[in-house]
C-alpha cells in the first residue's frame, strides 16, 4: 500500500512538472511569435519603436508598455486587430492581418504576452 501511495505521489509530481514545462514553453512560444511577427514595428520591448519604424513611418505603432492605454483595450479588440489587421478596427492599414498565418492559440499567447508587457488587464468584452 505504501509503495502504491509513493508511486501515485511521484506520478503527480512529475505530472505537475510537465504542466509547468508546458506553460513555460507556451510563454516562450508567445515571446518568439511576438519577436518574429510584431517586433519589427513594435520593438522587442513593445514600445512601438521597432527597426522598421523610421522618421518617415506614417503612423506610430502602439506602445504595449503603456498600461493606461492598454487597459482600455479588451482582449477581443486586440484579437480582432491581430487576426484581421488594423483596418478591421479602423486602425492603420500598415498593421497586417495575421489570421491566416498564425493559429488562434498563437494569438491567445500573444495577447497574454502583451498583457505581460503592459502589466495590465484589458477591459471586459
Question: Where are the language model's segments positioned?
Answer:
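Detector for the c-type heme attachment site
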Residues: 41-48, 65, 97-100
Amino acid at each position: 500500500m505504501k509503495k502504491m501511495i509513493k508511486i501515485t505521489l511521484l506520478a503527480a509530481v512529475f505530472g505537475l512538472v510537465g504542466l509547468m514545462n508546458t506553460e513555460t514553453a507556451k510563454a516562450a512560444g508567445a515571446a518568439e511569435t511576438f519577436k518574429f511577427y510584431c517586433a519589427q514595428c513594435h520593438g522587442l520591448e513593445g514600445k512601438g519603436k521597432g527597426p522598421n519604424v523610421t522618421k518617415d513611418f506614417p503612423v506610430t505603432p502602439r506602445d504595449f508598455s503603456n498600461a493606461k492605454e492598454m487597459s482600455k483595450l479588451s482582449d477581443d479588440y486586440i484579437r480582432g486587430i491581430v487576426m484581421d489587421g488594423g483596418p478591421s478596427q479602423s486602425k492603420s492599414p500598415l498593421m497586417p492581418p495575421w489570421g491566416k498565418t498564425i493559429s488562434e492559440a498563437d494569438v491567445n499567447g500573444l495577447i497574454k504576452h502583451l498583457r505581460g508587457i503592459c502589466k495590465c488587464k484589458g477591459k471586459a468584452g
